[in-house]
A protein has these predicted regions:
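Active-site nucleotide/adenylate-binding loops and adjacent lid/helix of ATP-dependent enzymes
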Residues: 2-10, 79, 87-174, 181-182
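Conserved N-proximal alpha/beta basic substrate-recognition cap immediately N-terminal to
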Residues: 6-119
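C-terminal active-site "lid" helix and adjoining low-complexity regulatory extension at the edge
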Residues: 29, 228, 242-281
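A short glycine-rich, hydrophobically flanked beta-strand micro-motif that places a catalytic Asp/Glu
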Residues: 42-45, 185, 232-244
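A short beta-strand motif that forms the metal-chelation/ATP-contact edge
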Residues: 56-60, 139, 187-189, 245-260
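Short glycine-rich anion-binding loops that position phosphate/pyrophosphate groups of nucleotides
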Residues: 64-66, 141-143, 255
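Generic preference for hydrophobic
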Residues: 82, 111, 137-138, 176, ...
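Phosphate-binding site of ATP-dependent enzymes
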Residues: 150-230
Length: 281
């Protein structure tokens, strides 16, 4: 029998439309483990921030805030398993994500992280972005998108206004990313490959669920390459296909909601956790 802590994500770090789904995937994983006789203590991200942390060998970690992640850091040094590792969660914060992916030759669009107060006409980093009328994406540069206005589409001519909107909301950094043409695919995975699903975003999970016209093998390879680089064990994200055999990573996140495949994903994550704990004993 194993005692473990399930740490639920703060609602402030979940996109509004996914808050119940984020809770549900951890609930489902916990249910599979407790059905095997494991004993759970459920805590919130706020509990972790305030230092209320039971000592157990395993922590299922859905925290995304920097303070909670920093408080979880010492646990691995003490021999506990933390899934996902707090370092991997922090790697998914946009400013770190861009640096990690761009520096390791992962197929990823040209992206610059700048102060939201920067002036597009004179900023040397923004000057590296194209000025040919193509679409640009402006994303909050600290943590993940929490609401629709955290990711906006614009062009070079509208960039100053888009960035000013982030400044007005007291978001100090933005990531400005070149648009990648082609269909967008959403993917979900578990580190050892026992679970990997994807579907075209424009078709929905019940539509073109496997996107057969796109190169699934290269998609899978790219997703796992990025997850391994960041240290993620439970992950999901988005890829664009400018060509059917050329996936480009747009985004990757720690422990997504897995909403279209929740039951199968919860079972797979629980199985992965059991095997991880068995391997260390």
């Amino acid at each position: 029998m194993t005692d473990f802590v399930a740490i639920y994500r703060s609602p402030s770090y979940s996109p509004m439309q996914h808050r119940s789904n984020d809770t549900a995937i951890l609930d489902g994983t916990v249910a599979h483990l407790t059905s095997k006789g494991w004993r759970v203590t459920a805590v919130s991200e706020a509990d972790i921030e305030q230092g209320r942390l039971p000592a157990v060998p395993l922590y299922l970690n859905m925290c995304q805030g920097p303070l909670a992640s920093e408080r979880l850091m010492p646990l691995e040094l003490d021999g506990a398993v933390v899934l996902n590792r707090p370092s991997s969660v922090l790697n998914c914060h946009r400013h770190r994500l861009v640096r990690q992916l761009a520096g390791n030759r992962v197929a990823f669009p040209h992206t610059v992280v700048v102060p939201s107060s920067a002036t597009p006409a004179t900023d040397v980093h923004l000057a590296s972005l194209g000025d040919d009328g193509r679409r640009l994406w402006v994303k909050r540069g600290d943590v993940h998108a929490e609401r629709p206005e955290d990711v906006v589409a614009t062009t070079r001519s509208g960039l100053a206004a888009a960035m000013a909107a982030f400044t007005a909301r007291d978001i100090p950094w933005v990531a400005v990313q070149e648009h990648v043409e082609g269909p967008v695919v959403k993917f979900y995975g578990v580190a050892d490959g026992r679970f990997f699903r994807y579907y075209r975003a424009d078709g929905g999970p019940s539509g073109a669920a496997t996107a057969p016209e796109l190169d699934g093998d290269r998609l899978r390879a790219l997703a796992f390459e990025a997850a391994t680089l960041l240290g993620l064990e439970v992950f999901g994200g988005d890829v664009a296909f400018p060509e059917p055999d050329r996936p480009v990573l747009i985004d990757i996140n720690d422990w997504p909601s897995f909403a279209p495949f929740r039951d199968a994903a919860a079972d797979a994550i629980a199985g992965y956790v059991v095997d991880r704990m068995r391997a260390r004993s």
